[in-house]
Amino acid sequence: PSFLGKKFDALLLDKKIEVINAGITGTTSIEESYRIKNELVDFEPDLFIVYGGINDVNLDLEKHLNHSKLETTIQKQLLTFTQIVLPEYKTTLLAPYALNHIITDLRNEDIITSSQEIDETNILQISSLWKDRWTEICDIGDEKEFKMIIILQPILGSGNKTLTGWEYEFLQTHGGDHNKTVYDKFATGLYDLEKSCDKVIDLRNVFDDHPEQVYFDSAHVTKRGNEIVANQIFNIVSPMVLEDIS
C-alpha cells in the first residue's frame, strides 16, 4: 500500500488519492469480508483492493465452514497492533515477525511456512467458498456505491519465474510443484468473480521477468517484490481511479 500510495502522489493531481492499508497479515477472506461489511464501509471508501489467496488455500475446510473455530493467535494480535493501530504501515514492520519465524521455526497454520504440502482434498470447495464471499461483497459494493478489485497474489512457484538458488531450495522443501498445482486449482474461482466485481487481477505471473530473489518464504516478498507488485497494480488500477475523479 505504501508503494501504491506514492505512485498516485507522484501524479500531482488536483484531488488527493488516499491509499489506506486496512489489511492484517495472516487473515483470510472470512475475516476480511466480515470487516468490510461491518466496519470498513462506515468510512465510505470509493474502492476496495483485496490482495490475497494463499491464506484461504492453507486454511482447512472445517474452519472455512465453521468460523467460530478460527482462533486469534498472539502473532495476529501483534500484527493487528503494528499494522492497524500504528499510524503507518511499512514493509520493515514485518521484519521482526519474519526473523522470529525463521529463528524459531514457528508454524502459523494460516500461512504456508512449513515443509508440509497444501492439502488438495477440498481445494475446489474452498475456492468456491472464497469466490462466494467476494461475490457477496462485490454485490454490496453495487448497492453502497463502492468498487471492488480482487487480486490473487503470487506465491513461490507460481507463474514461470526463474528461481534463484535459495528460492528453488526453499520451494523444494516447502511443497514443491504440488503447491503450485493446488494453487492453480484454487485460482479457478477467479473466473466467476469477473461477473460481479469491478475488476479481477491474477498476479501469479507477476515475477516472470524478474530472475532476482523476491521471495523470503512461500508467500511473502522482499521490498523489491512489493515494488514490482505495486507497479503492476498501479498500471491496471490507475485508469479506473483517474476516470472516477475526472
Regions found by a protein language model. Give the residues of each.
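Serine-esterase "nucleophile elbow" of acetyl-processing enzymes
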Residues: 1-25, 34-44, 49, 68-69, ...
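Solvent-exposed, polar/charged alpha-helical surfaces in well-ordered, non-transmembrane soluble domains
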Residues: 2, 6, 30, 34, ...
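Sec-exported extracytoplasmic/periplasmic mature domains
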Residues: 5, 9, 13, 37-44, ...
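Loop/turn elements at helix/coil->beta-strand transitions in domains of secreted/extracellular proteins
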Residues: 15-17, 43-48, 142-149, 196-199
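Residue-level recognition of beta-strand->loop/alpha-helix junctions
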Residues: 21-23, 152-153, 202-205
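Serine-dependent acyl-ester chemistry module
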Residues: 54-191, 208-212
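Histidine-centered active-site loop/cap adjacent to the catalytic His
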Residues: 130, 190, 195, 199, ...
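Active-site-adjacent bridging/hinge elements
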Residues: 199-211
